[in-house]
């Protein structure tokens, strides 16, 4: 099953900050790049400045590093 925009996915990459977390697929690139799936998360990572709420809440993954938890609703 191909991963599509809007799917809820679990992260299987052990070295990722979001390992075993669930995020939403924001986009899937079809150009053949190594990490084509952009996943958006609710929480941010540790890249913010001290005392700020900043940080990153998206990351790119390969399809093999993701497990679909819930498919996006069909239109």
Curated annotation (Swiss-Prot):
Q: Which GO terms describe its cellular component?
A: photosystem I reaction center; plasma membrane-derived thylakoid membrane
The record gives the membrane topology as:
Peripheral membrane protein
List locations, semicolon-separated. Answer: Cellular thylakoid membrane
Q: Reply yes or no: does the keyword Thylakoid apply.
A: yes
Query: Its Gene Ontology biological processes?
Result: photosynthesis
Q: What InterPro entries does this protein's entry cite?
A: Elect_transpt_acc-like_dom_sf, PSI_PsaE
Q: Does the keyword Transmembrane apply?
A: no
Primary location group:
membrane
Q: Which UniProt keywords apply?
A: Membrane, Photosynthesis, Photosystem I, Thylakoid
Give the highest taxon in the source lineage.
Bacteria
| PANTHER family documented for this protein | PHOTOSYSTEM I REACTION CENTER SUBUNIT IV A, CHLOROPLASTIC-RELATED (PTHR34549), PHOTOSYSTEM I SUBUNIT IV (PTHR34549:SF2)
Protein task: Stabilizes the interaction between PsaC and the PSI core, assists the docking of the ferredoxin to PSI and interacts with ferredoxin-NADP oxidoreductase.
* Family the entry assigns: Belongs to the PsaE family.
Q: Which protein, by its recorded name, is this?
A: Photosystem I reaction center subunit IV
Species assigned in the record: Synechococcus sp. (strain ATCC 27144 / PCC 6301 / SAUG 1402/1)
Please state the gene responsible for encoding this protein. Answer: psaE
């Amino acid at each position: 099953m191909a991963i599509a925009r809007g799917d809820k996915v679990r992260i299987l990459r052990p070295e990722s900050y979001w390992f075993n977390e669930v995020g939403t697929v924001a986009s899937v690139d079809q150009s053949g790049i190594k990490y084509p799936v952009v996943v958006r998360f609710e929480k941010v990572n540790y890249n913010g400045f001290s005392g700020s709420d900043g940080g990153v809440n998206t990351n790119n993954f390969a399809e093999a590093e993701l497990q679909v938890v819930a498919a996006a609703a069909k239109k």
